[in-house]
């Protein structure tokens, strides 16, 4: 009998041991840098996109500020020499550095390179929280209100910045892309969601108004609408696509400058769960997206559910491919805590692998009372890939800093020429939390 028990126990351990091992999350160690971001920034700063790798492999990035009097700062990083260079203060480059106005706190967009220049836009970073929502912060005594986001270029040879145009109505430019071939810049403003076009040849800005009802200044449950964070340009004909929370895909036509709806398709899918289009979050907008020239399709992710999907405008059709949340999130069966979703989403250097930085519950993290609550969910960060050719999903594991501290709140991604992945995370330094550049190798 004892022999049988020992045999049964041994067999059980042999079967379950591999399962137990496989459930232990892999760890990816990252390297953090020191950009010498200004002290005194409220909340340690933020980072939402604000990155890009130029043709020579140099990384350009912006560390954002939530303070009314400290602007976001732009830097370059040379991967060969490991040297970080401070390039500019965002308020200075648009001529507002000495105006004592609420600062240009962010660049909320990915940089686009064209004809020897980087193009991007600026945005405000100073908010007031009202009922759990971000509203433009009232200027401190003696300060002017925020003056509006700008379209900006940076000459990679001369180092000169050029202020191209300013958004009307004192709104920031939260979403940006560029038609490189035709020389047009596109943006969506915050908080009301006006669609903008700037033409490099004519140097004229056009405001098409908003399709977002009250935008993110609207009333929750009524006129509130989350604003799309990605404009996708089809290089074949210059069409620019963006979404609204109802799940509609809108198309700007380059030749006629008309905006209409893509007929016959919607991003409102049962798989994405029931989304409140007037509630806090992205609803049925795509959260992040890119155009894949291999099959001339748009690949995007639904922010709340983490489902990857493919949009074929020519058919037209929407195909749900795979939930690409982290393994811990998938196993929990729950949404990630951050209802907006994640923007660290891009096509890898091989042209067929999706790179995605996504949230994950950190188990057994102490709560504010100092005790452990197994039901409390706090976001860590996992690096996930999905091969569009083989349909293979891989969660490569949790990102941590050099000392094992979980990487927190990454909402940006850029891939170097050597395959190094860059993002921006909160980093503890000198007893404080600051925002900083980090990198890792997949």
Language model feature labels by segment:
Residues 28, 32-40, 87-103, 162-171, ...:
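Surface-exposed loop and turn segments in beta-propeller and other repeat-based domains
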Residues 35-72:
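Beta-strand-rich domains and repeat architectures in extracellular enzymes and scaffolds
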Residues 53-56, 113-115, 180-182, 234-237, ...:
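Residue-level detector of Asp-centered blade-edge/turn motifs that repeat once per structural unit
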Residues 59-62, 118-119, 184-187, 239-242, ...:
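Conserved beta-propeller blade signature
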Residues 64-68, 120-146, 356-380, 427-428:
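Short, conserved, GDST-rich strand-edge loop motifs in beta-rich repeat architectures
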Residues 74-82, 137-157, 197, 308-312, ...:
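Beta-propeller blade signature
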Residues 300-302, 306, 333-388:
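Loop/turn-rich, solvent-exposed surfaces of beta-rich toroidal or solenoidal domains
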Residues 407-442:
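Blade-level signature of beta-propeller repeat domains, shared across WD40, Kelch, NHL, RCC1
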């Amino acid at each position: 009998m004892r022999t049988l028990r020992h045999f049964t126990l041994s067999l059980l351990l042999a079967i379950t041991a591999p399962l137990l091992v496989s459930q232990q999350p892999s760890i990816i160690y990252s390297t953090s840098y020191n950009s010498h971001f200004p002290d005194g920034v409220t909340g340690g700063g933020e980072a939402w996109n604000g990155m890009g790798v130029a043709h020579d492999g140099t990384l350009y990035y912006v560390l954002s500020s939530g303070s009314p009097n400290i602007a976001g700062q732009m830097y370059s990083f040379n991967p060969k020499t490991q040297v970080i260079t401070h390039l500019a203060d965002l308020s200075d480059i648009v001529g507002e550095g000495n105006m004592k106005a609420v600062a240009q706190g962010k660049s909320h967009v990915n940089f686009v390179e064209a004809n020897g220049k980087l193009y991007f836009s600026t945005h405000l970073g100073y908010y007031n929280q009202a009922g759990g929502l971000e509203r433009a912060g009232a200027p401190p005594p003696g300060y002017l209100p925020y003056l509006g986001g700008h379209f900006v270029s940076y000459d990679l040879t001369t180092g000169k910045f050029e202020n191209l145009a300013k958004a009307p109505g004192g709104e920031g430019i939260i979403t940006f892309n560029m038609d490189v071939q035709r020389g047009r810049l596109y943006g969506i403003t915050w908080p009301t969601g006006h669609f903008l076009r700037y033409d490099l040849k004519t140097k004229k800005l056009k405001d098409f108004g908003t399709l977002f009802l009250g935008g993110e200044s609207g009333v929750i449950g009524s006129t509130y609408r989350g604003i799309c964070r990605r404009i996708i340009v089809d290089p074949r004909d210059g069409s620019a696509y963006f979404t609204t929370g109802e799940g509609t895909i809108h198309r700007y036509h380059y030749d006629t400058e008309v905006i209409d709806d893509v007929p016959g398709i919607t991003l409102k899918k049962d798989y994405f769960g029931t989304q409140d289009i007037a509630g806090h979050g992205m609803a049925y907008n795509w959260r992040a997206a890119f155009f894949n020239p291999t099959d001339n399709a748009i690949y995007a992710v639904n922010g709340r559910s983490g489902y990857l999907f493919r949009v074929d405008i020519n058919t037209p059709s929407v195909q749900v491919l795979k939930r690409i949340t982290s393994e811990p999130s998938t196993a929990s069966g729950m949404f990630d805590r951050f209802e907006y979703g994640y923007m660290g989403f891009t096509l890898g250097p091989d042209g067929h692998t999706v790179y995605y930085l996504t949230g994950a519950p950190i188990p057994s993290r102490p709560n504010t009372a100092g005790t452990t609550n197994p039901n409390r969910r706090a976001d860590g960060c996992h690096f996930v890939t999905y091969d569009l050719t083989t349909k293979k999903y891989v969660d490569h594991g949790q990102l941590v800093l050099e000392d094992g501290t979980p990487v927190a709140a990454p909402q940006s991604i850029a891939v170097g020429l050597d395959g190094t992945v860059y993002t921006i995370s909160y980093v503890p330094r000198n007893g404080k939390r600051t925002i900083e550049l980090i990198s890792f190798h997949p």
